[in-house]
From Swiss-Prot:
Predominant localisation class: membrane
UniProt cross-references to InterPro entries, sorted A to Z: DUF697, UPF0283
Domain of life (superkingdom): Bacteria
NCBIfam families tied to this protein: hyp_HI0043
Disulfide bonds: none
Membrane topology according to the record: Multi-pass membrane protein
Full protein name: UPF0283 membrane protein mlr0776
Bias-annotated ranges (Basic and acidic residues): 23-32
Family: Belongs to the UPF0283 family.
Pfam families per the UniProt record, alphabetical: DUF697
Length: 361
């Protein structure tokens, strides 16, 4: 048995109080005095550009059509003077011909005079029709500008005038009857100017836009097929020009333009000006890369691939013609792009390639 332990004293050191120092330090940090920072120097770190995240060029919307530049005053004077000289030359030649026929036989002179009178009368009628067609095309341009102005100012009165003029312009189109009737029922309603123009665009021009897209796709398919089977490149170019001209005229007639011969040339010039402004007249490397990216080069033969490229060029011309001949600019409806036609055209070309390969076997 051990002896009991003697009592002893121990020194106890005080513990640190972190709970008190930490709040004080945090409070001092939060309550520090404000200080000024230099704002004249900023460091901007640009984000890395991923080429695979770039928007598809065929899905991008083409810029709106720009108004064609007016001819200079001296150019108008020159062509006007040339026209007067040509008219005088034709008149003098006709007069001399009639005099010679009267000198040879009186009945021949009277016959020539009657034919000249009939020709002049027919020419006057043709010129009147051409001027009316040109005036109708000019009315389309004015209507587009007035619609843009009504949307920008949000003016209900100007928008109502635009809607009434649009309804009268496409009154001969049965596809627009339901839309015109719907707009007529809303005449007494209070609607903002911009919304009224957009509503008229969707209700009246919606069916015409659907038909226009079908026309453009069918024209692109025909160009693609003819390019695939034609033996010469000259035939391809000639048919592309022919199909593009026919597509421009059909789209103008669809939207109520009814262009004549002179009106067609003016419309074609406006379409080409739009293509030149938007840079869409040439198929660039980016467009070819998009076609290759869709796997077209691996699925189609060389001729059918060339046909798809020509078909997409025809579709681009059709889009420009659609925007030029449309009475209202694209506001409520989405402006069509090449992406709307590429999938259907490539499917058509792949089907034709499969049929050709199967028949060859």
């Amino acid at each position: 048995m051990t002896a009991p332990r003697k009592p002893a004293a121990f020194r106890i050191e005080p513990e640190a109080a972190p709970t008190q120092e930490t709040p004080k330090a945090r409070q001092a940090e939060l309550s520090r005095k404000p200080r000024g920072l230099k704002t004249d120097v900023a460091l901007v770190i640009p984000a890395e550009v991923d080429v695979f995240d770039e928007p598809d060029i065929v899905a991008a919307e083409p810029p709106p059509a720009a108004a064609p530049r007016k001819r200079s005053l001296f150019g108008s004077i020159f062509f006007g003077a040339i026209g007067v000289l040509v008219s005088l030359a034709v008149g003098l030649w006709t007069d001399q011909l009639i005099r010679d026929l009267f000198a040879r036989a009186e009945w021949l002179g009277w016959l020539a005079a009657g034919m000249a009178a009939i020709a002049v009368l027919a020419l006057v009628v043709i010129l009147i029709r051409e001027f009316l067609a040109i005036a109708r095309l000019a009315e389309v341009e004015k209507l587009q500008k007035r619609a843009l102005d009504a949307i920008a100012r949000d003016d209900p009165k100007a928008a109502r005038s635009v809607v009434d003029e649009l309804s009268a312009f496409v009154a001969a189109k049965p596809e627009t009857a339901a839309g015109r009737r719907a707009l007529a029922e809303l005449r007494g309603e209070i609607i903002d100017g911009g919304n009224l123009v957009r509503l008229a665009e969707a209700e009246i021009l919606g069916p015409l836009d659907a038909r226009a897209k079908v026309m453009i796709l069918e024209a692109a398919k025909r160009v693609s097929l003819v390019t695939a089977v034609s033996p010469r490149a000259l035939v391809d170019v000639a048919y592309v020009v022919f199909e593009a001209g026919r597509l421009i005229r059909r789209l103008s007639e669809l939207y109520g333009g009814r262009p004549g011969t002179l009106g067609f040339f003016r419309l074609a010039r406006s379409v080409l000006a739009h293509l030149a402004v938007t840079g869409s007249i040439a198929v660039g490397d980016s467009f070819v890369q998009q076609i290759v990216g869709h796997g077209l080069a691996a699925r189609l033969s060389a001729k059918l691939g060339e046909g798809v490229v020509n078909g997409m060029m025809t579709a681009r011309i059709g889009i420009a013609a659609m925007e030029t001949a449309r009475p209202l600019p694209f506001s409520a409806a989405k402006r069509p792009g090449l992406g709307d036609f590429l999938s259907a055209l490539t499917s058509f070309a792949a089907k034709k390639d499969t049929e050709t390969t199967g028949s060859g076997k």
